[in-house]
Amino acid sequence: MEIVAIDIGGTHARFSIAEVSNGRVLSLGEETTFKTAEHASLQLAWERFGEKLGRPLPRAAAIAWAGPVHGEVLKLTNNPWVLRPATLNEKLDIDTHVLINDFGAVAHAVAHMDSSYLDHICGPDEALPSDGVITILGPGTGLGVAHLLRTEGRYFVIETEGGHIDFAPLDRLEDKILARLRERFRRVSIERIISGPGLGNIYEALAAIEGVPFSLLDDIKLWQMALEGKDNLAEAALDRFCLSLGAIAGDLALAQGATSVVIGGGVGLRIASHLPESGFRQRFVSKGRFERVMSKIPVKLITYPQPGLLGAAAAYANKYSEVE
């Protein structure tokens, strides 16, 4: 059957027609992107998508939403849309829908993703296991964390708020970074470090620690400077970012009993070429008595262009697997 897959973020909403059957996503059509600010509601964007397609839309929707999906009224920063889950079927004139958190969608996507879209970062270069737990984390605007449980030919996605656990420094410089950030945030969660804005937090902390004058840069400019090696302090911040990402990826794998780890998120794709040469692996495996265990865990990175759309469709297919 056909469904409409939708990935809704703060500034953009992406639409695609997907075909699902027997719990699988058979195909995902061409993506259409709308700016949310140019459409007063999801309903109007839905109608615009139908007009662009030039035919009636399927009466089923799979929606990935960049925020919590529990509650009677859902809102996002930088997005004028308001979602009321109880009235979605009526507003969109559909029969069924699935509404999930955007990072939950990424976890669903991993369950359906071809291995060619998973780049090897470290550990054994082998396919993701067909049984067991896969830890999934993704730095973006924040830090998304989920885990994927595969068992007896089925899978289950468990969404978490793991991005909000405490940042744990592992050397003296990180002690100083934490102390500096506590002056601003009081409580420093790991997403204050491992996220798009996190690089700026590290950068400013390092400048203060070293007594180096610096100019406040927007995130895009800072990431560009760090990745292109145009600023020593930005490079140092990126090195610290990768160290911390490795540490928390390992911690989460231990906590979740994972047999493999997958990194997603917009930032993950940016640092794909940098990670293998960074201190990521050293921090990932350095877990004391469990170092040998950690060295046997494969770590992959998602390169699929739109995991949110694929994951939304996959979530629908998983829920309505009996529908042909």
UniProtKB/Swiss-Prot annotation:
It is found in: Cytoplasm. ATP binds at residues 6-11. The keyword Kinase applies. One of its GO terms (cellular component) is cytosol. One of its GO terms (molecular function) is glucokinase activity. Keywords: ATP-binding, Cytoplasm, Glycolysis, Kinase, Nucleotide-binding, Transferase. SUPFAM superfamilies: Actin-like ATPase domain (SSF53067). It comes from the Bacteria. It catalyses: D-glucose + ATP = D-glucose 6-phosphate + ADP + H(+). The keyword Cytoplasm applies. Gene3D superfamilies: 3.30.420.40, 3.40.367.20. One of its GO terms (biological process) is glycolytic process. Its EC number is 2.7.1.2. Belongs to the bacterial glucokinase family. This is Glucokinase. It comes from Zymomonas mobilis subsp. mobilis (strain ATCC 31821 / ZM4 / CP4).
